[in-house]
Amino acid sequence: MAQHLLHGTLHATIYEVDDLHTGGLRSGFFGKILANVEETIGVGKGETQLYATIDLQRARVGRTRKIKDEAKNPKWYESFHIYCAHLASDIIFTVKDDNPIGATLIGRAYVPVDQVIHGEEVDQWVEILDNDRNPIHGGSKIHVKLQYFGVEADRNWNQGIKSAKFPGVPYTFFSQRQGCKVSLYQDAHIPDNFVPRIPLAGGKNYEPQRCWEDIFDAISNAQHMIYITGWSVYTEIALVRDSRRPKPGGDVTVGELLKKKASEGVRVLLLVWDDRTSVDVLKKDGLMATHDEETENFFRGSDVHCILCPRNPDDGGSIVQNLQVSAMFTHHQKIVVVDSEMPSRGGSQMRRIVSFVGGIDLCDGRYDTPFHSLFRTLDTVHHDDFHQPNFTGAAITKGGPREPWHDIHSRLEGPIAWDVLYNFEQRWSKQGGKDILVKLRELSDIIITPSPVMFQEDHDVWNVQLFRSIDGGAAAGFPESPEAAAEAGLVSGKDNIIDRSIQDAYIHAIRRAKDFIYIENQYFLGSSFAWAADGITPEDINALHLIPKELSLKIVSKIEKGEKFRVYVVVPMWPEGLPESASVQAILDWQRRTMQMMYKDIVQALRAQGLEEDPRNYLTFFCLGNREVKKEGEYEPAERPDADSSYMKAQEARRFMIYVHTKMMIVDDEYIIIGSANINQRSMDGARDSEIAMGGYQPHHLSHRQPARGQIHGFRMSLWYEHLGMLDETFLDPSSVECIEKVNRISDKYWDLYSSESLEHDLPGHLLRYPVDVDGEGDVTEFPGFEFFPDTKARILGTKSDYLPPILTT
C-alpha cells in the first residue's frame, strides 16, 4: 500500500476491545487461583495486564495504561495528541499482554492512512489481526477514533510569533508566563571588552552577562534558600576567577560557600545525580566522572543537605525497562534557585525568587571564556581545573591541550522563576527524603508571590515558558489517571506519566519558523524511523524524537514554495571521551545517519524543483576548534605525553576541538530555547534522562514586520562573533544565501587552517566546517583527505557498534 507523509498532529482515542479471547488460561475460578499463586510467589505471569499501542509504520507514538484482569473486554478510553512527521501506509494499533519481561502479542489492527490524510474523523471498530494478517480467534475488534490535522492547517505554521498575545506551546505542564526578565549567558565567563558594539532596537547596544559571577552573587546574597540540581556538582571549583574583576570572598570554593551559607541559617538543598551505573564501557571512556561520592562526603556532617539521587524508573516499566532506566539514564537538569533582594526597592526587606537554567553544571572543566585557550591559561585559571577526558592519561603535569568548554545558560526572574522552584520541589519530594523544603507560605510576609518583574509595556520584558523531560519516577505530584495527565499537559504511557514538553517546544518552534534556525547542541541524532536501513534495522534503534525530521521537512516546504530558509547547526567534533572508543564511534554513526536522512530530503526537494543547488546552502553543520602558536612565558609541563599518542600529536600541532556542550536553538532572532536537553532520544524521550529548559521571546522584538533586534538577536550576533572572530553585515540576515555562503566559506577556510601541517598564527576564529561531504544523492561521505579527525585514529563518520545496545548511545 502506498505511503503518505503524515506531517502535523494526529488526535487518536483508543476506547476498548470487544470479546477478546487470550487463550482462556486466566478465565474462570481456577484461572484466578493460578494467577493469584503466580503473583504471590513472584513467578509466572499473574493476572492479565492488557495495553494497546499506536504505531506509524515503524515508530511507536502512543501507549495506553495497563488494564488488569479484564481479559475479555478491556476498556481504556484514552486520548492521544501525537505530533507526527512520518511516512506511513497504516496507523497500527497493537494489543499486548504485559509480562515481567517482555509482552505477549494479542494482535494488530490497521487503519489505512489514506482514510485520515484529508482530515476526516474516523470512528470505527477495526478488526484485530495476527502476524499473518488473519483475524484472531473470536474475531475481536478494537474501537478507535482518529483525526489528522496537517501542518498547513496550523495557524502558526510558517508565521513566527505574530503578536505579543502568542500563548506559548499548548498541551504542556507549565503555562507561558508574562512580565519576566531573562539574562542570556555565553560560556561561564566573559572578560571585559570582549564583545564589539552590537546595535539593538531603540538605540541600545548588546551587553553580555557573566554567568558564574551572577551565580556567585545569587548564592552569596541568599537569605532563606539555595536549591541546586546537577548532573555533577564539584565542591572544589571556584566561580570567580577573573583577576581583573575580583569580588569580596570570591576566592572561596563552591563547597565552602554553600557550607558557609548553610551555617548562616540558609536552607541549602542539593540533588546530585547518583552515578550507580555498572556499564563499564562508559566509565572507561571517561564519560561519567561526576564526583558524586566526593560531593556527598564533603557535605556529610554539615548543614548542607546533599542527596545523591539515582535515575529511578516510574512504576509502569517491565523488569528490563526498569533496569535500563536505573543503569543507563541520568538526572541531567542544571538549575540553581535562590531567594534574592528586590530590585530598586531602596531598603526593602522583601525577597523574590530567582532561578538559573541551562547547560552548565557547577563542576570542573566548565569554566571558560569565549577565547577558549588551549595552552595559555594552564598556569592560571585552569592550572587546578585541567579537563581533558579525550586522551588516556592526560594531566596538567603533561601539559595541554586542555579541552575548552563552550556552553550557554540563562537567569530567569519573575513568575517563570517560581516554575523552576516548583520543579525542584517536585523532585525533592520524590527523592529528597526528609521534608525540609522551605515553607514559602510561612514566609509570605517576606517572599513575594509570583508576580511580574516588568510591565508588559516595558520594551525589555519577556514572555517565558518552562519545559521538561521527566516522569513520575523523578517528580512527585503527577496525576495518576490518563485523563488527568492529559489535562495537565502530560503524556501517559504504560502506567507511567511523562512530561515531554521540551520536544514539543522544539517541534512548535521549528514549525513556526519563517526564515532561519540556529542550533548549538552537544548531540544531533534522531528521527531514526526515517533512516535508511544501511546495515541496521531502523525500528530497533528507537531514537524516535522528531526534531531532525521536522527541520528537514521545514526546509523542504520552503524549497517547494520558492522561499528562502536556512538551518545552521553547531556540534562538537565528537562526543566527549576517547574518540576511537566504541561508544563515541557509535554516536558518530547515528549522527551521520541523521545528517544523511535530512540531506536526502533536501536533495530530493531541490531535484523536484529542477534546482542544482548545494544542499549546504540550506542545511549546514559546523564544529568548533582552536589552534594557538606557542608564546614566550607559557606554562611548561614537567612531563611529556607518550610518544606517537594522540595526546602528543595534538600537543605538537597546538590544536584541539572546543567542546560544544550547548543546548540551544534560536528561531528568526525572536525565540530562544536554552536548557539541559540534547538533541538525542535520551534527552527528548521524557522517560530517560531528566531535563529542563526555558523557551522565551520579547513581545516588543518580534520579526513579524521587520527583523527582530532584541536581546536574542544580540545574543546570536555575540555568539557568531565568538565563533567567527568577526562581525559582518551579512550576518544580520541569516536567511539570505549571501549569509550562509559566507559563513560556509569562512568555516571551510578555518578548517583548512586548523588541519594544516604548519601554523604561523593563532586561528582567527573557531567555527570549522564539520568535516564531511554531501554527494549529489544526499549521501554523507568522507571529506576528501579526512577519514580520521586530526591527530587521532577516530573515524569521522563513526562506526556501527555490534555490541553496545542503541538505547545506550541514542
UniProtKB/Swiss-Prot annotation:
One of its GO terms (biological process) is phospholipid catabolic process. Ca(2+) binds at residues 187, 372, 406, 722. Keywords: Calcium, Cytoplasm, Hydrolase, Lipid degradation, Lipid metabolism, Membrane, Metal-binding, Repeat. A 1,2-diacyl-sn-glycero-3-phosphate binds at residues 332, 522, 661. It is found in: Cytoplasm; Membrane. Residues 1-36 form a propeptide. One of its GO terms (cellular component) is cytoplasm. InterPro entries: C2_dom, C2_domain_sf, PLipase_D/transphosphatidylase, PLipase_D_C, PLipase_D_fam, PLipase_D_pln. One of its GO terms (molecular function) is calcium ion binding. The active site is at 332, 334, 339, 661, 663, 668. Its cofactor is Ca(2+). Residues 327-366, 656-683 form the PLD phosphodiesterase domain. The keyword Membrane applies. Residues 1-126 form the C2 domain. Its EC number is 3.1.4.4. It is a peripheral membrane protein. Ca(2+) requirement for activity depends on pH. Active either under acidic conditions with micromolar levels of calcium (PIP2-dependent) or at neutral pH with millimolar levels of calcium (PIP2-independent). Hydrolyzes glycerol-phospholipids at the terminal phosphodiesteric bond. Plays an important role in various cellular processes, including phytohormone action, vesicular trafficking, secretion, cytoskeletal arrangement, meiosis, tumor promotion, pathogenesis, membrane deterioration and senescence. The propeptide appears to play a key role in the proper folding and activation of the enzyme. This is Phospholipase D alpha 1. It comes from Brassica oleracea var. capitata (Cabbage). The gene is PLD1.
